Amino acid sequence: MARVAARLSTDGKQSTHPVDEVLPLPKLALYGFQHVLAFYAGAVIVPIIVGSALKLSPEQLVYLINADLFTCGIASIIQAWGIGRIGARLPLIQGVTFTAVSPMIAIGLGAGGGTAALLVIYGAVITAGIATFAFAWLPAKAFRTVMRLFPPVVTGTVITVLGIVLIPVGLNDAAGGLGSPDFGEPKHFAYAGGTMLFILVLMKLGRPFLSSIAILLGLVAGTAVAFLLGDAKFGDVGKSDWIGVTTPFHFGVPKFEWFPIVLMLIVMLITMVETTGDTYAVGDIVGKEVDSETVARALRADGAATALGGVLNSFPYVAFAENVGLVRMTKVKSRFVVVAAGVFMIVLGLLPKAAAIVAAVPHGVLGGAATVMFAMVALAGIQTLGKVDLKEEKNALIVGVSLAFALLPATVPVFFSKHMDADLSSLLNSGVTLGATAAIVLNLIFNGLAKDDAHGAPEAGARALGEAEADTAPGSGTDADAIVPEASAPEAPAAVPAQAAAPAPSAAKADDADPTPSPSAP
């Protein structure tokens, strides 16, 4: 019997969970565009950095940016809308992972730079994407065993590391953008500070709707002021083409070489930890239970998007932590807002003029908004860690030492360039890579594999709450996750009386593919 993803209100009527609510079109457009603006700087910086390092021409660089935006849109729609058992059906934006930047540059320079280097990179990206996609289809028991590597102490640490590592990215934008001739000029900090203050005032004093679009309004207001003062340049809009279509294998047929493939597989292992943490974090923010099948669907979307990225001249994809911070700030939980953002990104990828308008937002303005969002990402990680018993010395050591490792590349970069070869340095010279690896290894040393209920055992609570109806129709494309009250502690009892667990009846949560208990959101 088909199960409806719904929750019961106090009068017994079914109501749609906020995640599955389709907002009116004007709100969808506004909220979706806000996600695009929040995501844009982080999205385009990877092709810019990689393309510049490989000495691509300006025209080739523009093509990379448009291809990235186009693929980001498709990937985000797959993740948020869902296709059968692919996609988490949560408000998760997909973007190119920063973790892959150094390895891709190393691969590209090793291949001689230019478009020939892109072909080697794309071969590795396609292979790693297919491998990730295949991994996420492991049998439920095997997949749950792997997911036990990521209890809250690991996912919370990784999300916190992401926020801490990303904050300097926002601050560099606030200073005018790395490499700009006037980097560090006071006017950039003035734009950043003014934008940040505008956002904070709206969040504090604005009505709920204004608060929910505070980032968008802050970016618009900051850009308007910069334009009036002559610091927002829209000249490139007129020079850009109206239409720019992304075609598969634009630069040629990919080349598949073993070492770049191995390097990219390691990168995807780290992005899997990122996506797992982001999935649990956004599930916690929106009040939607996350189990092992939800994580598997999110990782399948990652793998599919990464393989598609290699075909469409882009790079590896991950659930973007920046937009998790935005969901937390705005409290807009609908996944269809992300679908709308995906449509906007596809349009931007097809319309270079539209992309040029967004690109005209000054660095200082972007930096002010980005710093707020990245700080919220770190806070989401800290919130997850709040559900971990940090009074236990072993957990405190896992978090503290992992954070210390994550800061190593930023504080002592010479260690990697001076004492490691280029290939190893490109892999380890990343705060996210070191922090995530340290968290996983230290957790295994101190805690071993987590129990199946390490993320709160919502499935056990669902059984106690009653009536689990399984929807086993494959490829239905509907969200089969019903809503149960959130666990109030990280380790909920495996079974409690229904009367004590929930005074009001609620639809139980059953997994489409696996009726057995599995990990859930912290």
Task: Name each model-derived stretch.
Residues A2-L92, T99-G114:
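N-terminal signal-anchor module of multipass membrane proteins
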Residues A5-K13, A43-P47, G51, G194-L205, ...:
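Juxtamembrane interface elements at the cytosolic ends of transmembrane helices
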Residues G12-Q14, P18-V22, L30, F198-V201, ...:
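Hydrophobic transmembrane alpha-helices of multi-pass solute/ion transporters
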Residues L25, G51-R89, L263-R335:
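Membrane-embedded helical hairpins/re-entrant loop segments and their flanking transmembrane helices
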Residues P26-F39, A43, G184-M196, I213-A214, ...:
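Hydrophobic, membrane-embedded alpha-helices of multi-pass small-molecule transporters
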Residues Y63, R85-A100, V146-V154, L210-L217, ...:
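Short, non-helical or kinked segments that cap or interrupt transmembrane helices
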Residues L109-A232, A340-G456:
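Membrane-embedded alpha-helical modules
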Residues G431, G435-A501, P505-P522:
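Terminal cytosolic tails of multi-pass membrane transporters
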